């Protein structure tokens, strides 16, 4: 999928409200499927295509059920945001020292997460090409 017309008539997992709106506007049918069910949905024909992070594309072995991959290298305007969440009630129940530790660890994970995602963005081409997918 490189241009809106590529989506027409396809069953696509968008993964977010905004992506779902774009898919619908382009003439695609949005199919809500959790990331961990994309593999079986692609295999069974419930989905024709899915949008998800490079990390998920690799870790869920989606190259086994696909023939094509549009990478985020030059065809993307978004980056997958994968936050670490904690309820306000749980956070407020921590001591100030514990809250400080949570914030410090969160900050260190942010850098790690961004770097790991960048590595996966580069690695995905290799994984999908090796599987015989056409990568653009």
Predicted regions and their residues:
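N-terminal secretory/targeting leader peptides
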Residues: 1-136
């Amino acid at each position: 999928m490189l241009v809106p017309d590529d989506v027409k008539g396809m069953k696509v997992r968008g993964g977010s409200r905004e992506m779902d709106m774009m898919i619908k506007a382009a003439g695609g049918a949005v199919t809500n499927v959790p990331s961990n069910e994309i593999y079986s949905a692609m295999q069974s024909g419930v989905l024709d295509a899915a949008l998800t992070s490079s990390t998920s594309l690799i870790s869920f072995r989606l190259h086994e059920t696909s023939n094509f991959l549009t990478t985020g290298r030059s065809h993307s305007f978004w980056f997958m945001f994968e936050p670490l969440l904690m309820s306000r009630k749980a956070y407020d129940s921590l001591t100030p020292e514990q809250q400080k530790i949570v914030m410090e660890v969160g900050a260190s994970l942010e850098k790690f997460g961004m770097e790991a995602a960048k590595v996966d963005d580069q690695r995905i081409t290799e994984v999908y090409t090796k599987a015989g997918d056409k990568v653009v």
